[in-house]
Every structure is written in structure tokens, then in C-alpha cells.
């Protein structure tokens, strides 16, 4: 894996020197991340329809790669599930599942891919993104089979996120899980925004907000 990352870093360095590949790197930097944050979870860069996309890997419950979540680089927030002709089932997979520690009995759930990267950057590795606001029955069953006992809901600080957190709290408790809801304070919308407020001491800030 280390050898693979080294080769990818060299390749991305060459890309970065080319003007047309600077935009994705600048986009990552503005969101508080660096190249290694992307590469460490099997991320990459893709071109589709002459547009640049950041790719993150989707794995099924057997840790098999089944596709990619692609985020469009730019101001417009747009996502695609790849391959387009046979998109992976969101209800039967998780973004970055392969990188979830197996020895944990607690899982942190966030809404988006960049929220997930922010948690990992802060040292909270037992985290998964919903890539939305719902959790499927198959995903909950996977948690039960994986001996997950406690779920910490860390959704966005907006109306939709608060409603979803309340719904998920009820559903998860009915399924037998211990549930904790962590709500962001003030006008901070999500965990990626919080990262941008505390770039130099992010690990401490994240743990403080999670009351760890």
C-alpha cells in the first residue's frame, strides 16, 4: 500500500504541475484537505464529460470495491455514482467501508463525504458517511453483525439534518442500538466547515465538540 501511495503521489505531483490539474488540488486545499487525505482512502481524480471529479471508493459489506462516489470540482455541488451504466447500490454499501477499524463497537455517522474526511483527519477513524440522510435496513443489519453497539449521529446543523437525526435516533433505538446525537453549535453548517475554523488544532477541536 505504501508503494502504491508513493507512486500515486508522484503521479499527482506531475499532474499538479500541469495547469489543468491545479483546480482539484486547490479545491481540496480550500476545503481543508491535502492530497494524502484523499489518497489514504483510495481516492483519486477523474475526467468525465470534460469536467473534473474527485472519486472516493464504495465498498459492499464484504469490503469489495463496487463503485465510486464522484464529487464535481467547483462551486456547484454535484455527485455521481459510478459506473454510470451500473451504479452501485447505496443501501448495500458504504463509502470507505474498507478503512473502518474492525475492533470498534461504536460508529460515528455523518452526512457527507467531506464530513467523513474531516473526522478521519481529526483522528476519528470509526466513522462512516451516510451520503444522505437515511440508513437502510441492510446497513443496520451490517452494524448488528459487526457487533456495533453504539451509534453517534453527527449530522448537519440545518433543518433537514436535525429532522433526520431525530428519525434515525428513533429507528436505531428501536433496533436495539445505543444512540447519541451530537449537534453542532452556532451557524456552523457541517463538520467540514468546523474543520475550516480550526485548521491548526483540528483533532482537539473535534474531540471537544464530540465531548470525548
From Swiss-Prot:
GO terms for biological process: DNA replication, synthesis of primer. Residues 105-187 form the Toprim domain. It comes from the Bacteria. Gene3D superfamilies: 3.40.1360.10. GO terms for cellular component: cytoplasm. SMART domains: TOPRIM. InterPro entries: DNA_primase-rel, DnaG_primase, TOPRIM_DnaG_bac, TOPRIM_dom. SUPFAM superfamilies: DNA primase core. NCBIfam families: MG010. This is Uncharacterized protein MG010 homolog.
